[in-house]
């Protein structure tokens, strides 16, 4: 019986996609500005596999609001063309965690940033039964940043990712833009 309970606990624990490590002391004002999506990863292949996949979004700009929320401007392929979206990520008691109601996700979590070159974040849907997790590595310039990619890969090691995409400088410039 103890073995059965242990197996059940381990199975249930493995199903949780909750990100536990977020950045401490995030200064929301310093993330403002233009960003490029350098790499993406997701817990479910269908979230990123096609150009119009639900979480294959290209972050364009982050804008802190006077209330401490975060406005996220992004581009996404819809109906064969590039569409601009605006998401308001509402602040929570934890500086690096924001609440959203968009793209079927319910949280944005900032994992790490140096503010000048890169920002790592994840979008999480912890609701049953469609738990999902998608993360991105953003950079300030349309150039490949090996250090940022290294940090992204390190952050992903503890997460259940099943697909990962990276973009070269030409692809960064050609990302869905209006």
UniProtKB/Swiss-Prot annotation:
Pfam families attached to this UniProt entry: Lipocalin
GO cellular component: extracellular region
Compartment list: Secreted
GO molecular function: identical protein binding; long-chain fatty acid binding; retinol binding
PTM description: Alternate disulfide bonds occur in equal amounts in all variants examined.
InterPro entries noted in UniProt: Blactoglobulin, Calycin, Lipocalin, Lipocalin_CS, Lipocln_cytosolic_FA-bd_dom
Known tissue expression: Synthesized in mammary gland and secreted in milk.
Coiled coil: none
Main location: secreted
Superkingdom field: Eukaryota
Keywords noted in UniProt: Allergen, Disulfide bond, Milk protein, Retinol-binding, Secreted, Signal, Transport
Signal sequence extent: 1-16
Cysteines joined through disulfide linkages: 82-176, 122-135, 122-137
Described function: Primary component of whey, it binds retinol and is probably involved in the transport of that molecule.
Subunit structure: Under physiological conditions beta-lactoglobulin exists as an equilibrium mixture of monomeric and dimeric forms. Interaction with LMBR1L which mediates the endocytosis of LGB has been observed in PubMed:17991420, but not in PubMed:23964685.
Assigned protein family: Belongs to the calycin superfamily. Lipocalin family.
PANTHER family noted in UniProt: GLYCODELIN (PTHR11430:SF117), LIPOCALIN (PTHR11430)
Listed name of the protein: Beta-lactoglobulin
Gene of this entry: LGB
